[in-house]
């Protein structure tokens, strides 16, 4: 869950609920949930089509299937594309979260951006250096728990601050046109069939065919337990995403309660308070860190812990997966019978450090 829900999800999904592209247009509302439904269907395909295949072939790297099915060139190409795409994607998500922490907190402490990045990467490097996937399973469990707890605490605080129940919040969101899930306009890019089918294939490609996402599943003892893990994960993921969307609606209700409104400022259409943009990725940090209205310090601390907890599972998993894929798929470490264990270990550590520097 932590690997799937990165810092991008943590700030962008709530921030996108009230997003309006132009004056007079309908908000995105809960339209993202259409994609989440597609995710769920995709996980069923992964659990009952791809996982049995991986277990039958006893794969350490899922790209070995390409070698067995299509030959060495397809194998190396698939692994290379994974390394390229995961490097770009993971560093982009890492940058977003560190940038938010830097802009809202660290910059005021006069800490340079490169120092912030170096400290985060050093922490990830230290606890993945020895443990690999085994360490990540435990650390990701803790970090994901903190992230979800932070999400629940923030939702509870919003409800308490506005003195409303969950039912009343949903009614207010409905009045603000923030509860629409399904887009029935076939000409729209958000048409529900497009979103659901797109979400399904995103999951099949970005989970079922991704070494980072599958490394934990194929390390489970047997196929039945791995499928059970995948199915329970997919159900929980649906509810966690729904909670993120509810938080997004509450954040906009809270922002409007504090005087924010849609307007054109300097020729730019957006959601502003006192001339400052508080929409999209800026919304959650602006509320949680007290920039819109004074909040208890504990809420700011909870937000920071939850945001960091959202950052680490996606970054550490990517670092470990990139290391294992490069060593096994590109260097062919398992087949290097002329290398002793000490040399193989030295190569693994060198690749691990190199991937950290690449980040």
Identify the role of each PLM range.
Residues 277-312, 316, 333-347:
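Membrane-embedded translocation segments of transport machinery
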Residues 12-37, 67, 112-113, 145-301:
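Loop-to-helix junctions at membrane interfaces in multi-pass transport proteins
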């Amino acid at each position: 869950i932590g690997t799937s829900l990165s810092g991008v999800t943590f700030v962008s999904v709530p921030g996108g609920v009230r997003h309006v592209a132009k004056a007079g247009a309908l908000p995105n509302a809960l339209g993202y949930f259409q994609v989440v439904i597609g995710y769920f269907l995709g996980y069923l395909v992964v659990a009952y089509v791809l996982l049995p295949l991986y277990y039958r072939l006893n794969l350490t790297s899922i790209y070995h299937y390409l070698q067995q099915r299509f030959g060495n060139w397809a194998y190396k190409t698939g692994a290379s594309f994974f390394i390229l795409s995961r490097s770009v994607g993971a560093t982009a998500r890492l940058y977003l979260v560190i940038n938010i922490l830097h802009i809202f907190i660290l910059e005021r402490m006069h800490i340079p951006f490169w120092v912030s990045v170096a400290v985060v990467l050093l922490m990830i490097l230290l606890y993945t250096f020895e443990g690999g996937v085994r360490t990540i399973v435990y650390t990701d469990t803790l970090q994901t728990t903190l992230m979800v707890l932070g999400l629940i605490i923030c939702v509870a605080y919003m409800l308490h601050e506005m003195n409303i129940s969950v039912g009343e919040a949903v009614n207010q969101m409905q009045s603000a046109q923030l509860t629409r899930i399904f887009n029935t306009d076939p000409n729209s890019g958000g048409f529900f069939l497009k979103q659901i089918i797109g979400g399904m294939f995103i999951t099949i490609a970005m989970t079922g065919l991704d070494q980072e996402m599958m490394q934990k599943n194929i390390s489970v003892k047997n196929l039945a337990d791995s499928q059970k893990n995948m199915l329970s994960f997919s159900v929980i993921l649906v509810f966690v995403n729904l909670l993120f969307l509810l938080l997004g609606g509450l954040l906009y209700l809270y922002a409007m309660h504090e005087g924010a409104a849609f307007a054109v400022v300097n020729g730019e259409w957006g959601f502003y308070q006192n001339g400052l943009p508080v929409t999209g990725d800026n919304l959650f940090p602006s509320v949680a860190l007290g920039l819109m209205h004074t909040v208890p310090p504990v809420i700011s601390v909870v937000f920071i812990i939850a945001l960091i907890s959202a950052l680490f599972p996606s970054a550490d998993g990517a670092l470990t997966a990139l290391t294992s894929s490069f060593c096994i798929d590109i260097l062919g470490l398992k087949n290097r019978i002329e290398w002793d264990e000490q040399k193989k270990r030295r190569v693994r550590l060198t690749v691990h450090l190199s991937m950290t520097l690449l980040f």
